[in-house]
């Protein structure tokens, strides 16, 4: 693609050098630049891409997009813009032929529920006969091709390249999780969304965003800017959970028609006569398409909201009631989201990604609704992340569990013991009994907590303490198959660990 064609998309305020250049690739990492590349000098928190312009030229970049042209070496073509990230997002879409044009694209954002909602929307669209590609927290997938997801939302060049590849393979629709980081950093500005879905907003990522209002403003961009109708997609929709206070705010600011969902009688999509059990959720959906009876194998009230989000997205896309019902009633299995781990000890073992206070509370409330025995929770908090949520999560675990075992999550470069100490501050505020690990081996008779730094040992202890009828919840890591200690990733999978713990107990004739 010629630089002059990209320049029409980027719309630079100034330019220097020849625009009659053939561009072979787009890059924002100088180490990846190849011959004929266009380099985008992005300013980041820790680095400034302007410092790597010379390195990009030496690796073959023929032009550079900058915010400060004084940093460009003599003889190199440059384009000056106010926002290099926005320019890269638009250029990436054009370079890869605007792959989101002409197909339905659903973007899902919010603190909790994005991944499950993505799976549900995928199922609804697939039931409508649309071959769907999915870009999510867990994986990017289409058909029989699945690749692990390095980020919730990749950088704009990687995103557009991936979507182009998926469309070329036959995808006729795209469902993607859209993170607050991606919205703030303009990674998805080159995508043309048909539907945006807002699930909820609770405390998270405050290590990156200054405060909750900044976090909200990042999420809101999808609805206040990116859903504006244009010639390519004149009919767009904002699907919003208006039971959430931030969602209610967003509904009044959205630039697209709103399809509201929730449990209040005034919303467009809601559920009535709902029952929750170990078998799932049953009830009646009330929609603009009429009432739809349903049963889902998913568990809990928060998953009811995820179901409603998917139903509302189906309504917004103009899909049939049969497709909507068929999608949500299908065998939707979401890795690490209240995922069951089978065992022969009569214990309900659930693995969940809940890593915020709100998510943990939702999961534990769900467990409490279906549990017939005690609730044992094993969890920790990630290092180099928002410290403020640690005591909050500790207090929540202590309040809703019969036994909380606090352990390491991904400590990263922090001391695992120090993180555990901050979590324990929240639990101790409840005045619960503190158990030693050795003491728990013989069981426990009063609501309480313990600290075991090794996650493997914490899981083994929980398996040993649990008895038939109990629910054992392993929270925080979910689908992850690694643990980050220092700067190194080590293989670690909660599902594998708890299964191994029960096998060991069986081999010893225990349980």
Curated annotation (Swiss-Prot):
Residue numbers of N6-carboxylysine PTMs: 219
Pfam family, one: Mur_ligase_M
GO CC term (a single one): cytoplasm
UniProt cross-references to InterPro entries, sorted A to Z: Mur-like_cat_sf, Mur_ligase_C, Mur_ligase_C_dom_sf, Mur_ligase_cen, Mur_ligase_N, MurE/MurF_N, UDP-N-AcMur-Glu-dNH2Pim_ligase
Cofactor: Mg(2+)
Annotated residues for binding of UDP-N-acetyl-alpha-D-muramoyl-L-alanyl-D-glutamate: 30, 152-153, 179, 185, 187
MF (Gene Ontology): ATP binding; magnesium ion binding; UDP-N-acetylmuramoylalanyl-D-glutamate-2,6-diaminopimelate ligase activity
The keyword Hydrolase is assigned to this record: no
Source organism superkingdom: Bacteria
EC number: 6.3.2.13
Motif Meso-diaminopimelate recognition motif: where in chain: 409-412
First-tier enzyme category under EC: ligase
Keyword Flavoprotein among UniProt keywords: no
Function: Catalyzes the addition of meso-diaminopimelic acid to the nucleotide precursor UDP-N-acetylmuramoyl-L-alanyl-D-glutamate (UMAG) in the biosynthesis of bacterial cell-wall peptidoglycan.
Identification of the protein by name: UDP-N-acetylmuramoyl-L-alanyl-D-glutamate--2,6-diaminopimelate ligase
Species, as recorded: Geobacter metallireducens (strain ATCC 53774 / DSM 7210 / GS-15)
């Amino acid at each position: 693609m010629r630089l002059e064609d990209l320049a029409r998309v980027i719309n630079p305020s100034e330019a220097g050098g020849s625009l009659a250049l053939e561009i072979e690739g787009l890059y924002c990492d100088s180490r990846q630049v190849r011959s004929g590349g266009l380099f985008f000098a992005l300013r980041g928190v820790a680095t400034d891409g302007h410092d790597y312009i010379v390195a990009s030229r030496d690796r073959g970049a023929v032009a550079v997009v900058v915010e400060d042209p004084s940093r460009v070496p003599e003889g190199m073509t440059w384009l000056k813009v106010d926002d290099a990230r926005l320019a890269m997002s638009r250029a990436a879409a054009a370079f890869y032929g605007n792959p989101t044009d002409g197909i339905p694209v659903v973007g899902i954002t919010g603190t909790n529920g994005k991944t499950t909602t993505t799976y549900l929307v995928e199922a609804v669209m697939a039931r409508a006969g649309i071959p769907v590609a999915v870009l999510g927290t867990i994986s990017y997938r289409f058909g029989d091709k699945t690749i692990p997801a390095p980020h919730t939302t990749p950088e704009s060049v990687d995103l557009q390249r991936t979507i182009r590849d998926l469309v070329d393979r036959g995808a006729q629709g795209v469902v993607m999780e859209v993170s607050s980081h991606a919205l703030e950093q303009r990674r998805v500005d080159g995508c043309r969304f048909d539907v945006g879905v807002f699930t909820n907003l609770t405390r998270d990522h405050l290590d990156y965003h200054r405060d909750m209002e900044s976090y909200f403003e990042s999420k809101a961009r999808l609805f206040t800017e990116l859903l504006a109708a244009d010639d390519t997609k004149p009919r767009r929709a904002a699907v919003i959970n208006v039971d959430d206070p931030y969602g209610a705010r967003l509904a009044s600011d959205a630039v697209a028609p709103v399809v509201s969902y929730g449990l209040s009688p005034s919303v467009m999509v809601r559920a009535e006569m709902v029952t929750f059990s170990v078998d799932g959720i049953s009830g009646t959906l009330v929609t603009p398409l009429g009432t739809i009876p349903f049963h889902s194998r998913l568990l809990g009230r928060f998953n009811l909201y995820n179901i409603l989000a998917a139903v509302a997205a189906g309504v917004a896309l103009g899909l049939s009631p049969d497709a909507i019902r068929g999608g949500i009633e299908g065998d939707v299995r979401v890795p690490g989201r209240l995922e069951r781990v089978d065992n022969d000890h009569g214990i309900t073992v659930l693995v969940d990604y809940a890593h915020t206070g709100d998510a943990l509370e939702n999961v534990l409330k769900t467990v409490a609704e279906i549990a017939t025995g005690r609730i044992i929770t094993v969890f920790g908090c990630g290092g180099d992340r928002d410290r403020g949520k640690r005591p909050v999560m500790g207090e929540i675990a202590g309040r809703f569990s019969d036994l909380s075992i606090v352990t390491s999550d991904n400590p990263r470069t922090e001391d695992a013991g120090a993180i555990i100490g901050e979590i324990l501050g929240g639990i101790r505020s409840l005045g619960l009994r503190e158990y030693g690990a050795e003491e728990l081996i013989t069981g426990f008779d009063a609501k309480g907590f313990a600290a075991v730094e090794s996650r493997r040992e914490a899981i083994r202890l929980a398996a040993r303490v649990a008895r038939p009828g109990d629910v054992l919840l392993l929270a925080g890591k979910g689908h992850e198959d690694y643990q980050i200690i220092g700067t190194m990733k080590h293989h670690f999978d909660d599902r594998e660990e708890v299964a191994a713990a029960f096998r060991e107990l069986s081999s010893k004739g225990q349980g």
